[in-house]
Amino acid sequence: MVDRMKEQNISTSPESISLKQTEKIIEQMKNNSICRINNHGKGTGFFVKIPYKLRLLPVIITTNHAINIDDIQNNKIISLYLNNGKMTIKLDDNRLRYTNEKLDITIIEIKENDHNLNIKYFELDDGIINYFNLNEKERPNYLDDLNNIYLDESIYLLNYPKNKDIFVSYGKLLNINNSDIRHNCNIKKGTSGSPILLINNQKLIGIHFDSSNQNKYNKGGLLIYSIIEFSKIKKNLLLINKEGKNIIHQQLLDNCIIGELDIKEDE
């Protein structure tokens, strides 16, 4: 697939928000939008609200190597550390919304009685989880916001390095291809699962996975803006595996997507 970003012939986007304003927003996010996860070592996660029926479902997004299907099946208890407090949750099938080892991502529901913390969630227009492999003809209009992401765009990561306080790392987008992001932000152990955001408009565009073997760049996954609305007819949006291809469910675009997202009915 041709790299869509290269086709635009745009090197750097204008930064409409001053660094001072950006740092103020980052300070707010540092306190209650991300957490350190103590499980299989230490990693980072961030809080998002995803659309479900007529409401937004609060979840934590992290990597599959931080929380995996074995943790769910074993009902493991894990601790999430925020700057303003700690949350302990027991993993089970009712919490699991999505996990995929190949894509290295996990989404876990956060319940109201899990905490009394003032969590600030990334919401719908901040970006949300999905992965696509579409040519331009197949692209639905809700992917148009991707046209506003440029190579060499200034970005930052919010993360909890291992045994350290929260850390902000700045860098540039080096490449976007299909669902993959390459960037050059400075990373440390424990950074996996960090949100990747644009400096110019604070949009959440990705999740950091790890560094390359040669350490020439760092790897992440793309989070798509304006996630597909759940169908009023089909109460669950089922995303299934079809021959390993990253394409969308037939009801939406005659195809389907890697992995399975099972949003269960409310009791």
Please tell me what each predicted stretch does.
Residues 50-57, 198-203, 215-218:
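Short, solvent-exposed loop/turn segments that connect beta-strands within catalytic domains
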Residues 205-267:
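C-terminal cap/linker of serine protease catalytic domains
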Residues 62-68, 160-162, 189, 205-216:
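Short beta->alpha transition motifs characteristic of CBS
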Residues 3-50, 60, 105-106:
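N-terminal activation segment of mature serine protease catalytic domains
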Residues 46, 174, 186-209:
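Catalytic nucleophile loop of clan PA
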Residues 28-42, 55-57, 61-180, 199-200:
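Serine endopeptidase catalytic core focused on the charge-relay Asp
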Residues 4, 9, 16, 24-25, ...:
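Generic short N-terminal amphipathic or hydrophobic helices
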